[in-house]
């Protein structure tokens, strides 16, 4: 953090007591964190004419932020950080969901966060494919962005997704789909409950085919064994070897025992400023811990 730079924002969050999705728990601001933030803002010294610091708002790039982690009622951790990256701008590193209510499954939340974190330059009417799409939470998040979506999964999809005019269901496993069906796909997403090697085997067969022109990928890779975390650098190198030179990984706030890989062929691609956000009509539903 820059010494002497004024603190204009405060981020307060509680330690996660459960995995995301367990018993309805999801990370993010709570009534307690908001109240503690308000009290800290009132007590923080400032110039007489200066407004109190903002509490649990998305920080401006480069701003100085005071952190307070509520470990338990008797233990708080205090610190300061500079909002030098997208997750560093989010309170507690948790992607804000605005007023959206996820539907179908909590995969909706994971896709929302992966798009916000990666700044993947998707545009309305682009064609994307998701391997492992059932029951359709991720697909619904993509459809709400104005994308056209191929959902690839032998299992059934939710009726809300199936009825969307921009959705097509291919009831097959990813490696059983004809390569020409991917010829117009610009973005590839995966969320398959298998070890990372098997996910990447399927993806490699697709994106290295002569007829396929995928420009970017968001891959959810499962840590079926915690020791697999040691292989993450090698997994990223493998993806780069397919021509995706700009590749990075992060365990997102809404991830469970898994992490997200964002991969682009060209780093010069930029996300449009007018990207369509989530629609307000999403009905609340019970989320399964997947």
What kind of region is each of these model predictions?
Residues 1-290:
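SAM-dependent transferase fold signal centered on methyltransferase-like domains
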């Amino acid at each position: 953090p820059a010494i002497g730079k004024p603190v204009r924002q405060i981020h307060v969050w509680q330690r996660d007591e459960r995995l995301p999705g367990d018993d309805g728990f999801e990370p993010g601001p709570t009534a307690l964190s908001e109240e503690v933030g308000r009290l800290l803002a009132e007590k923080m010294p400032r110039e007489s004419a200066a407004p109190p610091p903002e509490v649990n708002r998305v920080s401006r790039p480069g701003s100085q932020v005071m952190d307070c982690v509520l470990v338990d009622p008797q233990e708080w951790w205090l610190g300061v950080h500079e909002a030098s990256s997208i997750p560093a701008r989010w309170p507690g590193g948790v992607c804000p969901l605005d007023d959206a209510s996820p539907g179908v499954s909590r995969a909706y939340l994971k896709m929302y966060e992966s798009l916000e974190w990666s700044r993947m330059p998707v545009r309305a009417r682009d064609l994307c494919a998701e391997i492992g799409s059932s029951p359709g939470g991720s697909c619904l998040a993509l459809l709400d962005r104005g994308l056209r979506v191929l959902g690839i999964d032998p299992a059934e999809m939710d009726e809300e997704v199936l009825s969307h005019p921009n959705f097509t269901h291919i009831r097959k496993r990813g490696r059983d789909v004809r390569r020409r069906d991917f010829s117009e796909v610009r973005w590839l997403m995966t969320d398959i409950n298998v070890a990372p090697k098997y996910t990447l085997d399927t993806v490699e067969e697709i994106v290295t085919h002569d007829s396929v022109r995928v420009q970017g990928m968001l891959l959810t890779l499962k840590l079926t064994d915690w020791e697999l975390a040691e292989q993450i650098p090698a997994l990223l190198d493998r993806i780069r070897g397919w021509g995706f030179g700009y590749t990075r990984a992060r365990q997102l706030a809404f991830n469970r025992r898994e992490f997200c890989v964002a991969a682009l062929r060209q780093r010069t691609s930029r996300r449009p400023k007018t990207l369509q956000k989530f629609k307000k009509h999403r009905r609340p539903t019970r989320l399964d811990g997947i």
